[in-house]
């Protein structure tokens, strides 16, 4: 992952894109999902620029850390349970290093469900928590988990998510933070 180690907001995707983060070495960098995400982050003043092309592009994100559950591209974009399990320790380490973390924004249902399963290893969560875009849930350690549709080209092109929806969610997070 990358960003501000003093982050209050953690943005979690599922995996690096084969021709984006996997190629560039930075999550949501050099792909269409990243173009959408960083435009939104820039417009709500979390990022200093509206693009993320490569790790030398000068991008800075304020009080935010961005990562993926998987650290490599899953074959055929379908992660196996073993891959998810093997990578979960890396995400747990990232979370434990973010001492000021207050809000976790998951991008996509699979990222949401897998983030939750990692949390359930550490905490007894009795409440039923379901993926619903824009829904927020208080976690046992006081952090807030928020679900969002993934900003994939398919979701953007079919208008499942748009710039206004994502910006509204980021503004909501700003009020929680």
Question: Which residue stretches match the model-derived regions?
Answer:
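A polyanion-binding, active-site-adjacent surface
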Residues: 1-131, 135, 139-177
